[in-house]
Amino acid sequence: MESNDIIYQTVSYIARHFREEMSLERMARDLGVSRFTLSRVFSGTFHRNFNQFLNEQRLNYAAIHLECSDESITDICMNAGFESQRTFNRVFRERYRMTPREYRILYKEKYLREEQT
């Protein structure tokens, strides 16, 4: 498999499966490549490791749902593929410098201000 094919397959696979329990080993097996090859794709192409890339996809999903839905934060966390609310809160805070609850409140306040102008 060519490098560009592996990159495409990797992005496509994660887009389809990020909400499920996932590991580098399982993904490599499903794509028919070695763990080492897949690990090189993440570091060389995306400049991050597998878990960092996966968490980014999950956080993007969660942020959209925090902004646009009234789902509970726990439901959003679980639907995004995080195994625990504790992990979700930690990873979310690392990226956004606030809790998911604070993010939701901030976004809704911003949205209300924009509607009033």
Predicted regions and their residues:
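Terminal helix-turn-helix DNA-binding modules in bacterial transcription factors
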Residues: 8-16, 21-25, 44-83, 105-117
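Short, surface-exposed linear motifs at loops/turns and structural transition points
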Residues: 28
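Short coil turns linking two alpha-helices in DNA-binding domains
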Residues: 34-35, 83-84
